[in-house]
């Protein structure tokens, strides 16, 4: 019986060309692929036939089933299994024409299609499909015209029906490490993947990770029946973090070399290991001396690691000499390991060459045997024996030539170029280019950026990401590390980047200690001076004045929250125009989600307001929210998919609905006011940085405009009046609601810079 646990569908385009497919398949089979389907939508029939013959020879030798997609005549001619889609040869006709000993698979997009083929087979007496490909699980770039996504629950429902009829099933479309374990708890028999393996730098490693993640026996029911020892044994080959080895020199001050590599590996979610090639006496001012231990000691270090630990990826840094390069190359060629990323350390910051001609030539030879090379602009020029590029296009052209002649992926890094952008790019051997936008950070503290990017890249590739996705993540992470480098205060020269800033920021954001104003003792609320406590951080002078003593007291109580908002990365980058567009788009999407619920809260206030004037104003505000929401969708989100509210957005809107529907009027007004007041204050502050070329000019104009400012003043006045008329207990509750809403406001702004960091290799 065929093992469908890991079913690979080939794609010559994703694989870098038809000539690369067989090599990818061979590697993937070594990693655990159990079924291979030849799918090629772009080549002519003769090319497909030739590819089928090549893969048949390979798969027969490896004992793996080969399936051909769509081509019934080729399947019959070569004795291959066949897979057809809903728009191909009708199933019953294909089953009758295909020899009985060959398996026939069918794409199923919904339950009706499965019921239909079961009924057709019963009516005609034709055998049921041997296997069905159910999907898509999620939207996928490899089949943009696919049916609507089913989700894991939809897959499970269809697979259960198939199982009842003795039909095997695999999940396809948007399948990867991120959902493999979840799919393993459904009745499906396997995972069907395309890009997860076809674009992987190491197909074998990618396949192994998928096989490890997909444990069909570990359903929620059976897990409870297994002992803890059995569970530990079952997952012994599923490490919690990719194991990444750095082979490089040292930096005692920690900014470069193995010290930077280990920080970068940890930042990327990996477990870092290191083998030292050279001991370097350097600091932020430069290199003083270099001591290279005997090669026998280097070999002993390598033996110590490889004899004991599985190495999921390797980052190569400073190798120093031709002998060292040759030894490392020999070692890598004779030992099992994951993808190799080579950072060709050849040029010092001063411009001096660090390697002699023989060592440079050895590095060029080594490049043929690694998966990714990450030279800076001067190093790329040396590798190509050319003058340094002065534009990104020139650098990409050099990289295309080197990638083609050395059959490796080259990362072009724009840091040494000039201009506002310091983009990075993936250049594949087939000449294809994937460019990652990256705004330049103006700092002299950039020591070790090359080491850091390469180590991060290796970690993300080891975690199962494509090189393109790995570069996107690493570029974004390193940009943040550069933006906060000046605050590290390490050394008096060109200091290091802040490798740990993202981790510290995320740790702080995850803190669950109740907010300070909720832990503080309740005040008596008798006066404006006794219903809340001033913040330990002085509040800035308000641009929109409080309407009286109560709202002034609330403003003075918010100093720490306001400071947190104003100094956040989101607000800082929004103001200077360096905010990444994906982060702004996410923010706008969540703002639209928020306004739909905020409108409900304002409408509720209209229904319980104590006077007709307030009722009318709240009702008008509620209507304006819906207008603004619609305008956000029209202006900023046209053509973009609208997502669901994040947990941060829901926490805020649920809080507002709860305060306005279950608490007194004054408490509800206090809860909704920070959205007005803080937004307007921030809008006026950011307006000072606005200009005609600002990428977010229109948004900044919206929240600093006179109409919004006037609405804010009116809302402040309504709260002041409500607090004047409220009882002491109501005032204290209202103050807490105002401060809680202000914290929610801070979290709402900050969430965009927390979005999109988790990748398939993260837990």
Curated annotation (Swiss-Prot):
Cofactor(s) needed for function: Mg(2+)
Keyword vocabulary terms for this entry: ATP-binding, Kinase, Magnesium, Metal-binding, Multifunctional enzyme, Nucleotide-binding, Thiamine biosynthesis, Transferase
Annotated segments matching region Hydroxymethylpyrimidine/phosphomethylpyrimidine kinase: 245-500
Molecular function as annotated in GO: ATP binding; hydroxymethylpyrimidine kinase activity; magnesium ion binding; phosphomethylpyrimidine kinase activity; thiamine-phosphate diphosphorylase activity
Residues annotated as binding 4-amino-5-hydroxymethyl-2-methylpyrimidine: 282
E.C. code: 2.5.1.3, 2.7.1.49, 2.7.4.7
ATP-binding listed as a keyword: yes
Stored Gene3D superfamilies: 3.40.1190.20, Aldolase class I, Heme oxygenase-like
SUPFAM superfamilies from the UniProt entry: Heme oxygenase-like, Ribokinase-like, Thiamin phosphate synthase
One Pfam family per UniProt: TENA_THI-4
A cellular component annotation (GO) from this entry: cytosol
Residues covered by region (Thiamine-phosphate synthase): 1-210
Region Thiaminase-2, annotated ranges: 550-763
Binding, 4-amino-2-methyl-5-(diphosphooxymethyl)pyrimidine: 37-41, 69, 107, 143
Record-listed 2-[(2R,5Z)-2-carboxy-4-methylthiazol-5(2H)-ylidene]ethyl phosphate binding positions: 140-142, 174, 194-195
Pathway: Cofactor biosynthesis; thiamine diphosphate biosynthesis; 4-amino-2-methyl-5-diphosphomethylpyrimidine from 5-amino-1-(5-phospho-D-ribosyl)imidazole: step 3/3; Cofactor biosynthesis; thiamine diphosphate biosynthesis; thiamine phosphate from 4-amino-2-methyl-5-diphosphomethylpyrimidine and 4-methyl-5-(2-phosphoethyl)-thiazole: step 1/1
Any one of the GO BP annotations: thiamine biosynthetic process
Cofactor remark: Binds 1 Mg(2+) ion per subunit.
InterPro entries: Aldolase_TIM, Haem_Oase-like_multi-hlx, HMP/HMP-P_kinase_dom, PM/HMP-P_kinase-1, Ribokinase-like, Thiaminase-2/PQQC, ThiamineP_synth_sf, ThiamineP_synth_TenI
Stretches that traverse the bilayer: none
Residues where Mg(2+) binds: 70, 88
Family membership noted in the UniProt record: In the N-terminal section; belongs to the thiamine-phosphate synthase family. In the central section; belongs to the ThiD family.
UniProt name for this protein: Thiamine biosynthesis multifunctional protein ThiED
Organism (species): Corynebacterium glutamicum (strain ATCC 13032 / DSM 20300 / JCM 1318 / BCRC 11384 / CCUG 27702 / LMG 3730 / NBRC 12168 / NCIMB 10025 / NRRL B-2784 / 534)
């Amino acid at each position: 019986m065929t093992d469908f646990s890991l079913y690979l569908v080939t794609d010559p385009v994703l694989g870098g060309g038809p000539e690369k497919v067989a090599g990818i398949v061979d590697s993937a089979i070594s990693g655990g692929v159990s079924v291979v389907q030849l799918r090629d939508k772009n080549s002519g029939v003769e090319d497909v036939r030739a590819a089928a013959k090549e893969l048949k020879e390979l798969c027969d030798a490896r004992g793996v089933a080969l399936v051909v997609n769509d081509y019934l005549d080729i399947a019959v001619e070569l004795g291959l299994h066949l897979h057809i889609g809903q728009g191909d040869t009708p199933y019953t006709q294909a089953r009758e024409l295909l020899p009985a000993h060959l398996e026939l698979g069918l794409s199923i997009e919904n339950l009706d299609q499965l019921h239909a083929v079961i009924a057709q087979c019963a009516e005609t007496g034709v055998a049921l499909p041997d296997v069905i490909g159910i999907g898509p699980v999620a939207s996928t770039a490899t089949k943009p015209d696919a049916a609507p996504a089913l989700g894991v629950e939809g897959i499970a429902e269809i697979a259960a029906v198939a199982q009842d009829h003795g039909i095997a099933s695999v999940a396809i479309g948007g399948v990867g490490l991120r959902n493999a374990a979840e799919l393993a708890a459904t009745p499906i028999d396997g995972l069907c993947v395309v890009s997860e393996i076809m674009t992987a730098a190491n197909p074998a490693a990618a396949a192994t990770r998928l096989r490890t993640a997909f444990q069909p026996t570990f359903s929620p029911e059976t897990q409870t029946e297994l002992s803890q020892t059995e569970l530990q044994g079952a997952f012994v080959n599923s490490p919690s973090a990719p194991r990444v080895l750095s082979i490089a020199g040292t930096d005692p001050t920690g900014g470069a070399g193995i010290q930077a590599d280990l920080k970068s590996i940890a930042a990327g979610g990996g477990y870092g290991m290191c083998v030292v090639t050279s001991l370097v006496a350097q600091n932020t001012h430069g290199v003083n001396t270099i001591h290279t231990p005997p090669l026998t000691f280097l070999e002993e270090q390598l033996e110590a690691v490889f004899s004991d630990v599985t190495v999921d990826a390797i980052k190569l840094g400073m190798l120093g000499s031709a002998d060292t390069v040759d030894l490392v190359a020999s070692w890598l060629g004779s030992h099992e390991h994951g993808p190799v990323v080579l950072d060709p350390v050849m040029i010092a910051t001063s411009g001096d060459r660090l390697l002699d001609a023989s060592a440079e030539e050895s590095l060029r030879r080594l490049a043929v045997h690694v998966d990714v090379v990450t030279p800076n602009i001067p190093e790329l020029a040396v590798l190509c024996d050319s003058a340094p590029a002065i534009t990104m296009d020139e650098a990409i052209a050099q990289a295309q030539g080197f990638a083609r002649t050395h059959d490796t992926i080259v990362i072009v890094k724009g840091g040494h170029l000039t201009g506002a952008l310091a983009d990075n790019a993936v250049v594949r051997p087939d000449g294809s280019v994937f460019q990652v936008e990256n705004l330049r950070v103006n700092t002299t503290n950039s020591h070790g950026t090359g080491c850091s990017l390469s180590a991060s890249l290796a970690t993300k590739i080891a975690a199962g990401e494509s090189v393109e996705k790995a570069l996107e993540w690493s570029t974004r992470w390193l940009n943040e590390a550069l933006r906060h480098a000046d605050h590290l205060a390490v050394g008096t020269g060109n200091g290091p980047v802040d490798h740990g800033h993202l981790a510290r920021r995320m740790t702080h954001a995850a803190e669950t200690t109740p907010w300070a104003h909720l832990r503080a003792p309740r005040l008596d609320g008798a006066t404006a001076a006794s219903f809340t406590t001033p913040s330990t951080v002085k509040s800035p002078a308000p641009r929109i004045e409080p309407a009286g003593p109560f709202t002034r007291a609330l403003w003075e109580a918010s100093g720490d929250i306001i400071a947190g908002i104003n100094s956040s990365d989101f607000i800082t980058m929004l103001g200077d125009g360096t905010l990444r567009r994906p982060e702004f788009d996410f923010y706008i999407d969540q703002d639209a989600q928020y306004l739909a619920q905020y409108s409900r809260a304002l409408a509720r206030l209209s229904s319980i307001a104590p006077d007709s004037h307030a009722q009318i104003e709240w009702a008008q505000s509620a209507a304006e929210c819906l207008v603004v929401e619609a305008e956000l969708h029209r202006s900023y989100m046209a053509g973009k998919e609208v997502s669901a509210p994040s947990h941060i957005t829901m926490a805020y809107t649920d809080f507002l609905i709860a305060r306005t529907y279950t608490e007194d009027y004054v408490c509800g007004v206090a809860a909704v006011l920070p959205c007005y007041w803080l937004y307007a204050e921030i809008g006026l502050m950011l307006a000072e940085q606005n200009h005609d070329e600002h990428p977010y000019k229109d948004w900044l104009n919206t929240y600093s405009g006179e109409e919004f400012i006037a609405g804010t003043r009116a809302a402040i006045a309504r709260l002041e009046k409500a607090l004047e008329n409220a009882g002491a207990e109501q005032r204290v509750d209202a103050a807490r609601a105002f401060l809680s809403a202000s914290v929610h406001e801070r979290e709402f702004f900050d969430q965009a810079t927390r979005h999109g960091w988790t990748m398939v290799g993260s837990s």
